[in-house]
Amino acid sequence: MSTKPFRALAAAASAAGIFTYARYRRELRLLSESVDAGGTIAETSAGPIEYAETGDGEPMLVIHGAGGGYDQGLMIASDFGKDYRVIAPSRFGYLKTPAPEDYSPAAQADAHTALLSFLGIGRAIVVAASAGAPSAIELALRHPQRVSALILLVPRTYHPKQSIGADESVPSQVVLRIVEGSADFLFWLAMRVSRAWVVRFLGVPPEVERKASEQERERVSQLMKSVLPLSARVHGIELDGLTTISEWPLERIAVPTLIISAEDDLYKTLPGARFTAHHIAGAELHVLPHGGHLMVQQTATVSKLIKRFLAARKPKPASRKSAEIELVNA
């Protein structure tokens, strides 16, 4: 029996593998060059902090979530921050911001304040997504005079009976191990051959993402790519995993506050979002019926909510029952 067909098949598979890996190396190089060139290092009183900024107007500090960096912060603000001076830092351990011995949310909040001072900014709107929320809350508690408004998007917050994190499904846990192992190639490959697994790991029901528009699916693809290179973000991811959340004295927060979460967020941020809104006087809570942790197909709705909130903000009278809960049918 001739072995030529098997040799030909092996040669084709080898060529495909070489081509795939070469494509990965090229894309990773471009991503690395882009992220290396986009940030600036501020030598603050809290140590060096990488950041980027764009736009003019009222200052808006945008704090990224897990797996991010200043680039993710800019992406978060791209739909609603066009009329603002957006400042997007890389949190401790992400990209070029080193991790100090004290990497707690309180220390990170002090670092945010140090960056604002370095830039000559007295007060700023503070927007935080996911794992960026703890330091944003600490900022509002520790330095209230520096915060003009607080916006928390699918936030990691305290709840007495519920913690957040990747769901326990096999796909999510496999991708989690890839991320924890800083395996750039495996993550890149998973985006192409097991997209639904990565989508689920990022907190979105795969069927929600599949039904989204092509434009929205491309936004999800860009958010996926923003995790690369993992090797430049893995220390920050580790620190987020080590950070424990304790109950805050939320009743002390007096700035206008907007919180947005989703019913189907697989990271289960909604219970904590409700708890947080209930304990901050005058806070607004908006619950999206679908969209998951990335708020898929909800970009226009979220932007509208934020713009309306910022246009109408003013201090609310203190009340334990002041949280307004609204279901957004979008």
Residue ranges: model-predicted function:
Residues 283-330:
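Catalytic active-site module of serine/aspartate enzymes centered on a nucleophile-bearing elbow/loop
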Residues 1-38, 118, 316-330:
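Short amphipathic, positively biased membrane-proximal segments
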Residues 107-124:
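Conserved acidic catalytic loop of the alpha/beta-hydrolase fold
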